[in-house]
Amino acid sequence: MRRLACYASSSRSELHSGRSRASRRDHGLIFYDKIPEGDANPEEVIWASRDAATRLHRLVDRFAGITYLVVDDADEASLAVGAIEELDGLSLATLLDAVAVDPKAARDLTVIAALGVLAPPSFEPRVFDEFSRLLADEEPAIRARTISAIACPSWPEFVPLLEAMASDDPHDEVRSRASVALAAFLQHLSGAT
């Protein structure tokens, strides 16, 4: 599965209805299932190819404040490009290019969440550098939100940053959040559940 696009909160109403443009155009996909939002999961709408080899998932994550698409298929690329364009989505490459041009844009809480959701499972230096910069931001709310966002990729490279924040951050809540995240990271990286 690959997370491929995020949508700002303002796009949520069109996507939340389940009647987005992607559902009206065929793309070889048909409605498969809708999973309502619960305490442990976001709302999810799933479309599948007629042979069930491809599935496109749209998740409305109220905790992160974003809506995003996930595709699972051997031929993700063509579906990904079409879905991103049709729904006016934001890919990781586009997001990184935008924050390179305007670094202040990365301080938006929705952008921080999108970076976390779109970060690949394997280490990506540009994303790591952006997160490192945000973890050092002067604003405690930005650092705290970034700690939540880095849980999505859970790269071991974050451990030293979390250790430093858990012991040295000037803000109590950020230190506390870093301690909790560090414990979760270490448990995840050790293979424990």
Q: Where are these predicted regions, by residue range?
A:
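Short Lys/Arg-enriched alpha/beta "domain-start" segment
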Residues: M1-V60
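Surface-facing alpha-helical segments and adjacent helix-coil boundary elements at the starts of domains
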Residues: E37-A105
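Structural detector for internal amphipathic alpha-helices that build alpha-solenoid repeat scaffolds
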Residues: Y68-E86, L109-S122, R143-W155, S176-L189
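Amphipathic alpha-helical scaffolding segments comprising HEAT/armadillo-like alpha-solenoid repeats
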Residues: G89-A100, P121-L134, P156-S167, S190-T193
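HEAT-repeat alpha-solenoid elements in large eukaryotic scaffold proteins
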Residues: V101-I112, A136
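Short inter-helical turns and helix N-cap capping residues of alpha-solenoid HEAT/ARM repeat scaffolds
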Residues: P103-K104, E138-E139, P170-R175
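Amphipathic alpha-helical interaction elements
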Residues: A151, A166-P170
